[in-house]
């Protein structure tokens, strides 16, 4: 092959490897005048045959470079065919005898003219410079990309500033004590539990945020390193372009050298006649040398065949290893599936146990509600019994007082009967005194009865008021119970949110590990690229050495032109065989590279599957231990429930027995009260009848006095006895008649119980309806608020889903964060109450904690979005690095071929 052909091939190879635009330019250059140039180059082969005799290996490499370069251009195959035909024709013509020397001189003149035309075209063509400009103008490794990435990295630090602002605000603000709207104190158990849960939640979120900030810093540092390495690669590419420019300069120098050689060729024509005789002797020597070289080439072919067989054996072994790895992979996948199935079974069991636990808890709550209701009813009955006992005692005291007064009246009656005999003279005075006494006595009894009725009414009103107060207290108690239930529900919701956040944190940690693995892979790729760059530099040095060898070969070409023409045909055949063997070797090498890459991938996949299997086995053992613990706790709870149910049943039975006793006592007391009332009525009637008898007796005494004066005392005494008997019968009848209306009056009084005030009832109903409407409005508002929160949580879960269920939240915190927590807990304040188990500051209220939670959640979302953008940027960097690697591989292949 000639020097011009070599120069054109090297320049086209270098310019094609840079950008696709250079490929188009080179295609356009070679498509127009390709056939003429290649014909000229084939004719120049007759002049430059000495080089192939001295260095056949270089010639073979150049032929390979031409064949591998042709597919990059349109119409390259036809041009190659033309060059081959031209070279064969030139070889046929070049094998001239000593007599046809004049024809050879005319043909050499034509070749000189064509060579000068090619050189003019090469000088006029400026495509290497334009290609270099395009590579620098449209290079993908511009610094604007790196500037954008650095600006994004700087924006990540905004999350840290936001966290510092939140901490400063929390430490600077002093909040007043907040009263709970339900009227419950802070020391109650439910609020303490709720605050503890909120504190744990905030601690976990702070741990997560600090860990994410540290990871962001690490990503930033890695990103800056990657950008610096990218800039270094770009500088190396610039150096490569500079070296290519130097090569172009050397090509120009070689063109000038070719012109000088053409001049020397003209001078050598005169010397050819003298050298013709010496050439024949040299040809014989060359025949001997070519025979030796043919033997060496045959040996090399045999070695290549042996290497080919060894590569085939290696390929078979690689296939066996790949099949074994596939089998192991399938077994591991089966184990993973079984482990996943067992995990699902365990999760289903845990769900069933949790459902049973909830059901038992509900039964326990219902039993507690029933026991409280029974206790309240018992308390009511006790109060009623106490009120009845007080009433009975009061009635007994009143009866005793009336009995005493009745005894006094009997004594007075006895005294009056004794004094009747003495009262004859004082009859007028006694009549007046008796009448006054009777009037005063009747008035006093009427006053006493009225006072007793008024007291009864007052006591009844007080009883009604007490009953209303008790009902109000019961309503208040029910409201408090409802508020407690609402607090329990909120506590459960908070616990569920905590669980979801923990799972999200696990996912975040898993993605962090993935990004770290990707970064390590990128580092390995960069190290490989550095090694490849060093290899390329070594190859450049070897290329310089080859250029020196080229110059030496040019000197040898002048001495060995005529001898190479006779041996071109044999060398071409050998070269074709060697090219075929090398192509096969390259294909086998590519195949072995693919096998090694597949083996590495399979090994990495098997390692990852083993790690996943270990994780699954650990999680399965943990779940089994948790299931056993849950079973033990369920057994304990069931035993406790049974014991409590038995105790409550015994208490209910005892209370029912006490109720029955108290009811019997109440019935007995009520019967006693009714009997006492009847006795009171009878005694009143007796008093009235005795007063009537006394009045009649006084009248009879007056009549007796009148009769004594008239002298008919005895007759009237007898009539007096009959009258007294008749008056007694009449008194008995009148007492019976009086008793019946009084009994009816008492029954009417019992029936005419003081009616309940309807206005009070209506007002109370209105109040209850208003409270019910307010509660309904609150419930509707809370439902809408819950729906909005659920929608927000669903949106946020889409962002965080990939970061959940992989790492435990306890492994996120570092020693530095623990020291900071200890320092803040010693200083006191809101942050100290977050980091400790007990509230260190009274300013930490529910509203404040919710605001802190919202701010921290916003910061967490920002950090997650920034992590996602960083991941995308890393992916783009990976694609660019892969492109660089491909570019370097192409350059290596071209340098090897050249």
UniProtKB/Swiss-Prot annotation:
Residues 718-734 have a biased composition (Low complexity). The modification N-acetylserine is found at residue 2. Keywords: Acetylation, Coiled coil, Phosphoprotein. GO terms for cellular component: trans-Golgi network. The keyword Oxidoreductase does not apply. Signal peptide: none annotated. Residues 703-717 have a biased composition (Basic and acidic residues). GO terms for molecular function: small GTPase binding. The modification Phosphoserine is found at residue 740. Residues 201-712, 759-803, 855-894 form a coiled coil. Residues 82-95 have a biased composition (Polar residues). Residues 1-43, 68-95, 702-749 are annotated as: Disordered. GO terms for biological process: insulin secretion involved in cellular response to glucose stimulus; response to bacterium; vesicle cytoskeletal trafficking. This is Coiled-coil domain-containing protein 186. It comes from Homo sapiens.
């Amino acid at each position: 092959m000639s020097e011009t052909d070599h120069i054109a091939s090297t320049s086209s190879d270098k310019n094609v490897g840079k950008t696709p635009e250079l490929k188009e330019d080179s295609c356009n250059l070679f498509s127009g005048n390709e056939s003429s140039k290649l014909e000229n180059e084939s004719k120049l082969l007759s002049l430059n045959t000495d080089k192939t005799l001295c260095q056949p290996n270089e010639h073979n490499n150049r032929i390979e470079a031409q064949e591998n370069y042709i597919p990059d251009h349109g119409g390259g195959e036809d041009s190659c065919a033309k060059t081959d035909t031209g070279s064969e024709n030139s070889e046929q013509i070049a094998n001239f005898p000593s007599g046809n020397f004049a024809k050879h001189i005319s043909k050499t003149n034509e070749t000189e003219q064509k060579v000068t035309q090619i050189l003019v075209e090469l000088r006029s063509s400026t495509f290497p410079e334009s290609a270099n400009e395009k590579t620098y103008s449209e290079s993908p490794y511009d610094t604007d990309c790196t500037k954008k990435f650095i600006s994004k990295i700087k924006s990540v630090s905004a999350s840290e500033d936001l966290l510092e602002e939140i901490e400063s605000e929390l430490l600077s603000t002093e909040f007043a004590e907040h009263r709970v709207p339900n009227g419950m104190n802070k020391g109650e158990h439910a609020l303490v539990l709720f605050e503890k849960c909120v504190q744990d939640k905030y601690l976990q979120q702070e741990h997560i945020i600090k860990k994410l900030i540290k990871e962001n810093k690490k990503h930033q540092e890695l990103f800056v390193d990657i950008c610096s390495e990218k800039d270094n690669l770009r500088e190396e590419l610039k150096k490569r372009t500079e070296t290519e420019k130097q090569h172009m300069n050397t090509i120009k120098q070689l063109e000038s050298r070719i012109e000088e050689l053409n001049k020397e060729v003209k001078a050598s024509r005169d010397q050819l006649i003298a050298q013709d005789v010496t050439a024949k002797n040299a040809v014989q020597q060359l025949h001997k040398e070519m025979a030796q070289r043919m033997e060496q080439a045959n040996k090399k072919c045999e070695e290549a065949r042996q290497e080919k067989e060894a590569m085939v054996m290696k390929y078979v072994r690689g296939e066996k290893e790949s099949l074994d790895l596939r089998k192991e992979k399938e077994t591991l996948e089966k184990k993973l599936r079984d482990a996943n199935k067992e995990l699902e079974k365990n999760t289903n069991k845990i769900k069933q146990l949790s459902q049973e636990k909830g059901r038992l808890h509900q039964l326990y709550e219902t039993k507690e509600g029933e026991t409280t209701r029974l206790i309240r009813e018992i308390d009511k009955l006790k109060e009623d019994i106490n009120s009845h006992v007080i009433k009975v005692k009061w009635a007994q005291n009143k009866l005793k007082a009336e009995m005493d007064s009745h005894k006094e009246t009997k004594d007075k009656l006895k005294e009056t009967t004794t004094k009747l005999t003495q009262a004859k003279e004082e009859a007028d005075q006694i009549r007046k005194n008796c009448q006054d006494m009777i009037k005063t006595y009747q008035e006093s009894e009427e006053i006493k009865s009225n006072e007793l009725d008024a007291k009864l009414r007052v006591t009844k009103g007080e009883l009604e008021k007490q009953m209303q107060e008790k009902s109000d207290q019961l309503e208040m108690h029910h409201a408090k119970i409802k508020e407690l239930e609402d607090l329990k529900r909120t506590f459960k919701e908070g616990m569920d949110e905590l669980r979801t956040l923990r799972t999200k944190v696990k996912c975040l940690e898993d993605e962090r590990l993935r990004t770290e693995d990707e970064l390590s892979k990128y580092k390995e790729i960069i190290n490989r690229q550095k090694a490849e760059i060093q290899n390329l530099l070594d190859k450049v040095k070897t290329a310089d050495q080859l250029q020196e060898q080229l110059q030496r070969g040019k000197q040898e070409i002048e001495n060995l032109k005529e001898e190479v023409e006779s041996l071109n045909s044999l060398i071409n055949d050998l070269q074709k065989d060697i090219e075929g063997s090398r192509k096969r070797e390259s294909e086998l090498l590519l195949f072995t590279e693919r096998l090694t890459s597949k083996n590495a991938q399979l090994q990495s996949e098997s390692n990852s599957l083993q790690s996943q299997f270990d994780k699954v086995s650990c999680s399965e053992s943990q779940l089994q231990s948790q299931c056993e613990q849950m079973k033990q706790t369920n057994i304990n709870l069931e035993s406790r429930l049974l014991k409590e149910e038995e105790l409550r049943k015994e208490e209910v039975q005892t209370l029912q027995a006490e109720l029955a006793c108290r009811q019997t006592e109440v019935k007995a007391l009520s019967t006693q009260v009714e009997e006492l009332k009847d006795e009171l009525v009878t005694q009143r009637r007796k008093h009235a009848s005795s007063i009537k008898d006394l009045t009649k007796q006084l009248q009879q005494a007056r009549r007796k006095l009148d009769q004594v004066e008239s002298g008919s005392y005895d007759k009237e005494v007898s009539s007096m006895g009959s009258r007294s008997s008749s008056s007694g019968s009449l008194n008995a009848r009148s007492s019976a008649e009086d008793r019946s209306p009084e009994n009816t009056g008492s029954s009417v009084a019992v029936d005419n119980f003081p009616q309940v005030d309807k206005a009070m009832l209506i007002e109370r109903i209105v109040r209850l309806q208003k409270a019910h409407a307010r509660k309904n409005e609150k419930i509707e508002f809370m439902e809408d608020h819950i729906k909005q929160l659920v929608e927000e949580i669903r949106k946020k879960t889409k962002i965080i889903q990939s970061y959940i269920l992989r790492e435990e939240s306890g492994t996120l915190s570092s020693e530095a964060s623990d020291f900071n927590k200890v320092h803040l807990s010693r200083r006191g304040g809101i942050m100290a109450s977050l980091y400790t188990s007990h509230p260190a500051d009274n300013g930490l209220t529910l509203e404040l904690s919710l605001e802190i939670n919202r701010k921290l959640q916003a910061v967490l979302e920002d950090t997650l979005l920034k992590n996602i953008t960083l991941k995308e940027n890393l992916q783009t960097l990976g694609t660019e690095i892969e492109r660089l690697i491909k570019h370097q591989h192409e350059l290596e292949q071209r340098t090897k071929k050249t």
